UniProtKB/Swiss-Prot annotation:
<protein>
    <recommendedName>
        <fullName>NALCN channel auxiliary factor 2</fullName>
    </recommendedName>
</protein>
<feature type="glycosylation site" description="N-linked (GlcNAc...) asparagine">
    <location>
        <position position="178"/>
    </location>
</feature>
<keyword id="KW-0812">Transmembrane</keyword>
<feature type="transmembrane region" description="Helical">
    <location>
        <begin position="362"/>
        <end position="382"/>
    </location>
</feature>
<dbReference type="InterPro" id="IPR055288">
    <property type="entry name" value="NALCN_aux_factor_1/2"/>
</dbReference>
<keyword id="KW-0472">Membrane</keyword>
<keyword id="KW-1133">Transmembrane helix</keyword>
<dbReference type="GO" id="GO:0098703">
    <property type="term" value="P:calcium ion import across plasma membrane"/>
</dbReference>
<feature type="glycosylation site" description="N-linked (GlcNAc...) asparagine">
    <location>
        <position position="77"/>
    </location>
</feature>
<comment type="function">
    <text>Probable component of the NALCN channel complex, a channel that regulates the resting membrane potential and controls neuronal excitability.</text>
</comment>
<comment type="similarity">
    <text>Belongs to the NALF family.</text>
</comment>
<feature type="glycosylation site" description="N-linked (GlcNAc...) asparagine">
    <location>
        <position position="153"/>
    </location>
</feature>
<dbReference type="GO" id="GO:0005886">
    <property type="term" value="C:plasma membrane"/>
</dbReference>
<keyword id="KW-0325">Glycoprotein</keyword>
<feature type="glycosylation site" description="N-linked (GlcNAc...) asparagine">
    <location>
        <position position="97"/>
    </location>
</feature>
<feature type="transmembrane region" description="Helical">
    <location>
        <begin position="42"/>
        <end position="62"/>
    </location>
</feature>
Length: 401
């Protein structure tokens, strides 16, 4: 009895000692656990708030971009803008279809976009005196200069920066035909039974090449609509990729210079612009690549770039309503290229601001999550330490027995 009572007393003393020892250890852990719960709740609230605000911000940004594209000013007075200074957003590019002009450009550009099929027949009827035309050419004293001035009023449908005069000057053998300027003039004004046949055949050859280029562009446009519906980069948007791809197609089918040009470059350099501006597309998994081997390859481009040989083309991305100032409206500096530098437009600047804002939000979110993880780890370590302190004290009576 005495021994048992003594043991019981020692056990009670041990329990009291345990209470006295563990009390200052458990109390801070309990308080820190409450603090950690509040921190976790706050971190979760901030996380969902950041996601919601970012979603609303992106929606608002998309509406602003569409509003900017809708109200983008076109070239109503091209001569005045050429004198006062040109801006990138004034070029009036239609992102949906690069082969058509805006409604404000139709009237001012109607004469230059006259039907190509009637170009030779109208000139032949004018020679015969059966019809009067606003482009008067004196038949007995016709000169190559007057002949070219007449054909400068006719441009291609897809590669609209090129006129028939540009093609007659530099591309004299389309599809194996003889389309030299001297041969066309002799065919039109020789007085033979087949007057105008050579002119019509050359115009049809140019039209067929233009249609082939448009078909290739439509295939590429379907590809961009499928894989690149949204802008994929701050420095290179989808419409810039489409524009430079169209310029490359026209340079490949019609490697000729233009009369109105601000800057010249080898025609094959457009291929490098497409590689630098457009992303790399994997056709098997609908993903975009920003590194690795490009899917658009330029055969023999490096040799031609170093030697600077080959025909020169006008560095024109797109033109305005008037062909006389269309080259001034050209975006001759594309971002991310190897030889050009372009000012960031308002859309690119807004994309940059949105990207910086998203990065800032992401950094803050990562910091909160990291702080929460460290706090939870500290709480688990505190709980483990308190258990390690309690277990040896409970084993004291067993050791004494």
């Amino acid at each position: 009895m005495i021994t048992g009572a003594w043991r019981c007393g020692r056990k009670l003393d041990a329990e009291l000692e345990i209470c006295r020892v563990t009390e200052p250890i458990d109390k801070p852990c309990a308080e820190s656990e409450k603090v950690q719960r509040w921190r976790m709740s706050l971190a979760s609230l901030l996380f969902f708030t950041a996601l919601l605000s970012d979603h609303l911000w992106l929606c608002a940004g998309g509406k602003l971009r569409s509003r900017d594209r809708t109200h983008r000013r076109t070239w109503n007075n091209a001569s005045h803008d050429a004198q006062t200074g040109l801006r990138d957003e004034d070029c009036g590019v239609l992102l949906s279809n690069l082969t058509e002009n805006g409604p404000d450009c139709v009237e001012a550009d109607a004469r230059r976009r006259a039907p190509l099929e009637s170009a030779c027949s109208t000139l032949y009827r004018q020679k015969s005196g059966s019809v009067s035309s606003s482009y008067s050419v004196t038949v007995p004293t016709v000169s190559p200069h007057a002949f070219l001035e007449y054909f400068r009023n006719f441009s291609l449908s897809f590669c609209d920066a090129l006129t028939i005069a540009d093609l007659l000057e530099s591309m004299t053998s389309p599809d194996g035909l003889n389309c030299s300027l001297t041969h066309i003039i002799r065919d039109l004004f020789s007085g033979g039974p087949e007057d105008g046949d050579a002119c019509s055949a050359c115009v049809h050859a140019y039209t067929r090449l233009d249609q082939h280029a448009q078909e290739k562009y439509e295939e590429f446009d379907a590809l961009t609509r499928k894989y690149m519906a949204d802008d994929y980069s701050v420095r290179a948007q989808t419409h810039l990729c489409q524009v430079v791809y169209k310029a490359w197609l026209c340079a490949e089918y019609f490697p000729v210079p233009q009369r109105q040009c601000v800057r010249w470059l080898p025609c094959r350099h457009y291929c490098g612009e497409v590689t630098a501006t457009c992303p790399f597309i994997l056709p098997d998994n609908d993903r975009l690549l920003y590194a690795g081997s490009p899917s658009f390859l330029c055969a023999g481009f490096q040799e031609e770039y170093l030697s600077s040989q080959g025909p020169d083309c006008c560095d024109v991305r797109w033109s305005g309503c008037d062909s006389a100032v269309g080259a001034a409206c050209a975006l001759t500096h594309l971002p991310g290229s190897f030889s050009f530098h372009r000012r960031l437009s308002s859309g690119a600047m807004s994309c940059t601001n949105r990207l910086h804002g998203s990065k800032l939000k992401l950094c803050v979110l990562v910091l909160f999550l990291l702080h929460t993880f460290i706090s939870i780890t500290t709480l688990q370590h505190c709980s483990t330490g308190s258990l390690e302190a309690i277990v040896p004290l409970e084993e004291v009576p067993m050791r004494e027995e």
